[in-house]
Amino acid sequence: MVHLKTLAGSAVFASLATAAVLPRQSASLNDLFVAAGKSYFGTCSDQALLQNSQNEAIVASQFGVITPENSMKWDALEPSQGNFGWSGADYLVDYATQHNKKVRGHTLVWHSQLPSWVSSIGDANTLRSVMTNHINEVVGRYKGKIMHWDVVNEIFNEDGTFRNSVFYNLLGEDFVRIAFETARAADPDAKLYINDYNLDSASYAKTQAMASYVKKWLAEGVPIDGIGSQAHYSSSHWSSTEAAGALSSLANTGVSEVAITELDIAGAASSDYLNLLNACLNEQKCVGITVWGVSDKDSWRASDSPLLFDGNYQPKDAYNAIVNALS
């Protein structure tokens, strides 16, 4: 979530392009998106935000899926070897269960927010054992409670080569197969995703690498169900046609589904949000959208005001435009 692409406000299809901004309506984003043929409209959260009454009220009323922003990352769950801390993740999963929400698990294998005891491992067999044990413990604990798992996250550089990480350095690209096969065995019913950012143009080297490797891994029997495009955008200069084309190119790899997994857009222009909404609506395999937070004040990009609710938890024009477009 470092390099942010930009999105141009080019034409969206007619029913969305003409959408006027309306006052906030009672129907939830999730209900409206499901009525439009998709599986969910979600957000990210964690225990502290779910205990914030203003934030929680919006999560409860607007979204159908919750992604843990940080509580399921390796440093949160297993800060020292074999010592798991489940309280934050348990809280989120329990909240989702009690409020009839689903959960996207995020993330099992990632180079960042990785404890030093893992990143300093120097032996391939040790790392393989540590990685498979971590996946088995985490996925096994929440078996049957997680809709999607982001199994591997941000594994490519911008030029399409593999990112320098302890996983790739010791195990080569085989760490991807090991991670997915382990996750599949631990919970056969969860959809398994590979997730990354800057997958925003079909001609971009990173997008092409993702598509090429996923096709290769699927042909080799690696159980990848979906590709997640994070969609952290900057201002209005990136072609929405390219964004839609990129989503299509990911869908055409042979995966069963794709999703927009961490959406936020600097400035939160209504036209930009509608363009991404439209890209998912027009791609049959796009099952849903997750926005990366509720209120601008709690965003990792707070100064960019990138979300659908302002710092006072009030709906912004982009929220109203989405509701109107889907109504």
Swiss-Prot record:
Broad EC category: hydrolase
Temperature dependence: Optimum temperature is 52 degrees Celsius.
Entry EC number(s): 3.2.1.8
pH-dependence of activity, as noted: Optimum pH is 4.9.
Principal localisation: secreted
Active site: E154 (proton donor), E262 (nucleophile)
Pathway(s) served: Glycan degradation; xylan degradation
Catalytically driven reaction(s): Endohydrolysis of (1->4)-beta-D-xylosidic linkages in xylans
GO molecular function: endo-1,4-beta-xylanase activity
Disulphide linkage map: C280-C286
Subcellular location: Secreted
The keyword Manganese appears for this protein: no
Induction: Expressed in presence of xylan and repressed by glucose.
Signal peptide: 1-24
Chain ranges of the GH10 domain: 44-325
Keywords: Carbohydrate metabolism, Disulfide bond, Glycosidase, Hydrolase, Polysaccharide degradation, Pyrrolidone carboxylic acid, Secreted, Signal, Xylan degradation
A single BP term in Gene Ontology: xylan catabolic process
Modified residues (Pyrrolidone carboxylic acid): Q25
SUPFAM superfamilies xref list: (Trans)glycosidases
GO CC annotations on file: extracellular region
Annotated function: Endo-1,4-beta-xylanase involved in the hydrolysis of xylan, a major structural heterogeneous polysaccharide found in plant biomass representing the second most abundant polysaccharide in the biosphere, after cellulose.
Protein family: Belongs to the glycosyl hydrolase 10 (cellulase F) family.
Name of this chain's protein: Endo-1,4-beta-xylanase C
Native source species: Emericella nidulans (strain FGSC A4 / ATCC 38163 / CBS 112.46 / NRRL 194 / M139) (Aspergillus nidulans)
